[in-house]
Amino acid sequence: MSTVTDPNPDIVYLPISPKTLELCKDPYSKTDKILYQRKTDKLQDEIPLFNFHHAMKVSAYKHGSLVSQIIKPSTLGEGNTGQDLATIAWNFAVASYYKATGIPWKLSQLDAETCYVGLSFYKEVKDGQSNLRCSMAHVYLRTGESQVIRGRPFKWDSANKGRPYLTSPELASEIITDVISLYRRQRNNQDPKRVVIHKSSPFRNEEIEGFNEALANIETVDYVHINEHSGIRLFPKGEAYPPIRGTFVYSGNQSVLYTTGYVPLLDTYQGISVPSPLFLRAFRMDSPPEQIGKDIMALTKLDWNNADFNTRVPVTISVARKVGDILSESSLQDVDDFPTSYRYYM
């Protein structure tokens, strides 16, 4: 006699009542973030698990491979959220639809044979070692797949080396080889014709050597450092509005791109402060600079955690950063088969 089990739900909602939130939120913060455990220098070296949202994401996956959505009172429009109810409803609907295996929208201008990769790093505590870092790749395809690949941990001395990077060509080659393997599994064993790698820090020689080795058979390759804090500003002469969204100025392998700004179709600038452009530096550039800018513009429209017109940073960078925060939770360290779909982390 066979055992019949119910399939997992597409999504599990976890509502937090106002009373629970009031009892558990951080009394030293004006936000509604729930206090899981107060961070101290000692605890940070031992157990990097302080974010309730991240801990719940890990728990939902570990105990049933569940996709979850935490619902706080502000999610339903209670309190001063700064958003109207229609915007809140749209954001909630878009996020829920994606988590329940839907694709809210696609962009036709993204090339079907291009693989977009965002690299990030996060802190991992394992076997009492607090000096470990791990690389993480967010892989995005035109069809809407948004996948996560975790690299191998490596030792890192932040006091002497600053921001993490892949310290050997082997580490760099390994994670990009895994990216290509993922692409081939989803594309009937076909390689991508073009691979674009985005990082929020400069590419090091060790990384470039390893990436080039892993991508030796790929026709077109671009390595782009995306700097969000360059301090550069452009001011149109005699104009009341800031530069138009999409303004792109380049020279050689460097460029400035406004992913936010005045939108002629809406006849307004939707921000409240002077927009800041992204500063781009290509460490390898097989594609025309205009194509690199167009890719980034398109990837700012694919954050399915809300229904916003666009975000300032492309999803290759923003999603990699968010997923890295969750992967650093100590309760995930004993999970070998961690989820690859972004739905589990959002």
Regions found by a protein language model. Give the residues of each.
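Long, contiguous domain-sized segments
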Residues: M1-M346
